[in-house]
């Protein structure tokens, strides 16, 4: 099984989402040693944001693309193929200013591709990635789950994943991290307990 592990936090070793996403992957490997992990750090190796140049590159025949267009097309193709090849995805998704990191949004824009991850039909849009499992590691300084302030974070990610057909979704949540050392410790402990006792108990 191929597992795509994505981190998007800019905080490096101080990141709770990185710590927890790593622990999810480690637990997954312990439950299934055959797992092949591909790691993408969207902060250290940021993907260029979706732009007019991206669309122009996609619409230009390969043999007449200039260097910039070739780079854009290659980036889009490699990012998409990496996602399509994965059987499962672990996404570290901290909340920044009520939404996901811009680096994660740039990745989403490269994998939300009509005809590849979804398609339009007479009955409406149809997701094409229903065979994938996703574990979303959601972290935030405040308490936003189920609140209007969380609409651009977890809710947005659930809408996107559902749109491309993913229904096998687990959320590991550590919120309230900025409410003090005790609250932070409790939130991380609860997330770690979920990883250890729930995610892979039957794996």
From Swiss-Prot:
Q: Which UniProt keywords apply?
A: Flavoprotein, FMN, NAD, Oxidoreductase
Native source organism of the sequence:
Pseudomonas putida (strain ATCC 47054 / DSM 6125 / CFBP 8728 / NCIMB 11950 / KT2440)
Reactions the enzyme catalyzes: 2 a quinone + NADH + H(+) = 2 a 1,4-benzosemiquinone + NAD(+); N,N-dimethyl-1,4-phenylenediamine + anthranilate + 2 NAD(+) = 2-(4-dimethylaminophenyl)diazenylbenzoate + 2 NADH + 2 H(+)
What are the disulfide bonds?
Answer: none
Q: Which residues form a coiled coil?
A: none
Q: What does this protein do?
A: Quinone reductase that provides resistance to thiol-specific stress caused by electrophilic quinones.
Q: Which GO terms describe its molecular function?
A: electron transfer activity; FMN binding; oxidoreductase activity, acting on NAD(P)H as acceptor; oxidoreductase activity, acting on NAD(P)H, quinone or similar compound as acceptor
Required cofactors, per record?
A: FMN
Q: How does it assemble?
A: Homodimer.
Residues reported to bind FMN: 9, 15-17, 95-98, 139-142
What name does the UniProt record give this protein?
Answer: FMN-dependent NADH:quinone oxidoreductase 1
- For this protein, the Enzyme Commission number is 1.6.5.-, 1.7.1.17
The source's superkingdom equals: Bacteria
Q: Which Gene3D superfamilies match?
A: 3.40.50.360
Free-text remark on how the cofactor is bound: Binds 1 FMN per subunit.
Tell me the protein family, please: Belongs to the azoreductase type 1 family.
Q: Which Pfam families match?
A: Flavodoxin_2
Enzyme class, spelled out: oxidoreductase
């Amino acid at each position: 099984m191929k597992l795509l592990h994505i981190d998007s936090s800019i905080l490096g070793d101080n990141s709770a989402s990185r710590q927890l996403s790593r622990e999810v992957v480690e637990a997954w490997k312990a439950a299934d040693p055959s797992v092949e992990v591909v790691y993408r750090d969207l902060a250290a190796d940021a993907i260029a944001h979706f732009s007019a140049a991206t669309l122009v590159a996609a619409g230009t025949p390969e043999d007449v693309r200039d260097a910039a267009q070739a780079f854009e097309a290659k980036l889009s193709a490699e990012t998409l193929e990496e996602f399509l090849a994965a059987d499962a995805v672990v996404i570290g998704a901290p909340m920044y200013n009520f939404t996901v990191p811009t680096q994660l949004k740039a990745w989403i824009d490269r994998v939300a591709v009509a005809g590849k991850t979804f398609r339009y039909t007479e009955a409406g849009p149809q997701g094409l990635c229903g065979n994938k499992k996703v574990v979303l590691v959601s972290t935030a300084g405040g308490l936003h789950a189920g609140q209007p302030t969380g609409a651009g974070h977890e809710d947005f990610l659930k809408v996107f994943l559902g749109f491309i057909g993913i229904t096998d979704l687990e959320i590991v949540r550590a919120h309230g991290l900025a409410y003090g050392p005790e609250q932070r410790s409790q939130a991380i402990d609860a997330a770690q307990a979920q990883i250890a006792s729930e995610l892979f108990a039957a794996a």
